[in-house]
């Protein structure tokens, strides 16, 4: 049996990217579950059929806490999806493994802090700092991808 693909690229950037990106996708699922739990606890449903199932049409309403969860999830989609593309392509540029791991780790930790700050209603500027820190490795990877692509035109 041939060795697993990840064994062939160990010591390179791809395994670190796969770990961080998978953990981030799991985090997004957790935020979605939290959103559902907050909806149930606050009895604030987006659809009439859900409200009817849980007590009546009066529960088809918005709620500040549900909206906060939705904004956190939307922000995840706005930042994590681009990271998935950038990190994947960047992994194949042959970056220094340690530097690549730091890019992925900084993004991962920034997004974790951002989510905790958003859902936990932490004081400003915690959330915006976490957002900014997480965007730095994305900008770095994007610039390196553009540079490499331009050099090979």
From Swiss-Prot:
Q: Where is this site: Essential for protaglandin-E synthase activity?
A: 50, 127
Q: Name one GO cellular component term.
A: membrane
Q: Where in the cell is it found?
A: Membrane; Cytoplasm, Perinuclear region
The family line of this record is:
Belongs to the MAPEG family.
Q: Which domain of life is it from?
A: Eukaryota
User: Which reaction is the catalytic activity of this chain?
Assistant: prostaglandin H2 = prostaglandin E2; 2-glyceryl-prostaglandin H2 = 2-glyceryl-prostaglandin E2; prostaglandin G2 = (15S)-15-hydroperoxy-prostaglandin E2; 1-chloro-2,4-dinitrobenzene + glutathione = 2,4-dinitrophenyl-S-glutathione + chloride + H(+)
Q: How does it assemble?
A: Homotrimer.
Q: Which organism is it from?
A: Canis lupus familiaris
**EC assignment:** 5.3.99.3, 1.11.1.-, 2.5.1.18
| Organismal lineage | Eukaryota, Metazoa, Chordata, Craniata, Vertebrata
One Pfam family for this entry, by name?
A: MAPEG
One GO BP: sensory perception of pain
Residues the entry annotates as binding glutathione = 39, 74-78, 114, 118, 127-131
Spans traversing the lipid bilayer: 14-42, 62-91, 97-120, 125-153
State the protein's name.
Answer: Prostaglandin E synthase
Entry cofactors:
glutathione
Q: Does the keyword Transcription regulation apply?
A: no
